[in-house]
Amino acid sequence: MADDLVDGLTRAGLPGAKASARYVRVSPTKARRVVDLVRGRSVGEALDILRFAPQAASEDVYKVVASAAANAENNHSLDPATLWVGEVYVDEGPTLKRIRPRAQGRAYRIRKRTSHITVVVESREPVSAAGRGAKTTRRAR
């Protein structure tokens, strides 16, 4: 995935910033469900989606997206209105293994999974409302 940003530039060559949360006590598969909601969206829209998402992992992802936006604003002097969620991914962290006692001397293994959540925001020019829905007409031959 993405290593570190080189001179404040993302992989796509756009200015941006990175934030990550490591060893978060949420399953990577559940965190990926939430991360997929915000990939490629503007930071403001992503934060709105995460604020009202019913999944428990949305709170952790919200904090990382907000931190990446703050890093871009404070460390690289980027305008928050032009920030987009460029790269966002969840890696698997170490699994905590616990034991649950069961009947007749048995024991079940409980696996408490952890995640590393990484968000890279990049500064793009905002798409105007007129440019988004404009259609080109074909000339008659």
From Swiss-Prot:
Q: Which domain of life is it from?
A: Bacteria
Among PROSITE patterns, the record links this protein to:
RIBOSOMAL_L22
GO molecular-function terms, A-Z: rRNA binding; structural constituent of ribosome
InterPro entries this protein is in? Ribosomal_uL22, Ribosomal_uL22_bac/chlpt-type, Ribosomal_uL22_bac/org-type, Ribosomal_uL22_CS, Ribosomal_uL22_sf
Q: What cellular-component terms does GO give this entry?
A: cytosolic large ribosomal subunit
Q: What keywords would UniProt list here? A: Ribonucleoprotein, Ribosomal protein, RNA-binding, rRNA-binding
* SUPFAM superfamilies in alphabetical order: Ribosomal protein L22
Q: Does the keyword DNA damage apply?
A: no
Output one GO BP term: translation
**What CDD domains does its record include?**
Ribosomal_L22
What do we know about how this protein assembles, alone or with others? Answer: Part of the 50S ribosomal subunit.
Protein's job: This protein binds specifically to 23S rRNA; its binding is stimulated by other ribosomal proteins, e.g. L4, L17, and L20. It is important during the early stages of 50S assembly. It makes multiple contacts with different domains of the 23S rRNA in the assembled 50S subunit and ribosome. The globular domain of the protein is located near the polypeptide exit tunnel on the outside of the subunit, while an extended beta-hairpin is found that lines the wall of the exit tunnel in the center of the 70S ribosome.
Q: Which NCBIfam families match?
A: rplV_bact
Q: Which family does it belong to?
A: Belongs to the universal ribosomal protein uL22 family.
Specify the protein name. Answer: Large ribosomal subunit protein uL22
